[in-house]
From Swiss-Prot:
Main location group: cytoplasm
Oligomeric form and interacting partners: May form oligomeric structures.
Keyword NADP part of the UniProt annotation: no
CDD domains in the record: ACD_ScHsp26_like
Protein name: 16.9 kDa class I heat shock protein 1
InterPro entries, per database record: A-crystallin/Hsp20_dom, CS_dom, HSP20-like_chaperone, Small_HSP
Family recorded in the similarity comment: Belongs to the small heat shock protein (HSP20) family.
Xref: SUPFAM superfamilies: HSP20-like chaperones (SSF49764)
Biological processes annotated in GO: protein complex oligomerization; protein folding; response to heat; response to hydrogen peroxide; response to salt stress
Organism of origin: Triticum aestivum
Compartments, record wording: Cytoplasm
One CC-aspect GO term: cytoplasm
Amino acid sequence: MSIVRRSNVFDPFADLWADPFDTFRSIVPAISGGSSETAAFANARVDWKETPEAHVFKVDLPGVKKEEVKVEVEDGNVLVVSGERSREKEDKNDKWHRVERSSGKFVRRFRLPEDAKVEEVKAGLENGVLTVTVPKAEVKKPEVKAIEISG
């Protein structure tokens, strides 16, 4: 059985030439204990926006269950999103024509700014999108004291 992966769906000619690193990639997973199938999923797409009240992270995790995701804060200011998407069980009688969905472990880390209230982080998973909200501490405006000028 052979599985055909298209490396770039926007370039139909990308698969015409052999990748000189394919041999290396097939060896590396055995050494590192990983899987070449995790490569695309390891780079889960993330949007990070800042609002006046919070930092909001949106992570695309299609097909991942809530129980397969962890959201943590390490070292006081590093947001870590990690987890694993299980591989579909294979039946010996199945014939695969294309495998494009990734499986395996993933991890993303983000250094949070100083104004992040890490003790109030909230996360929710809906429709394959993980939303992590990190509230911001209120920035106190410096007090201005008028000084009377004598003379």
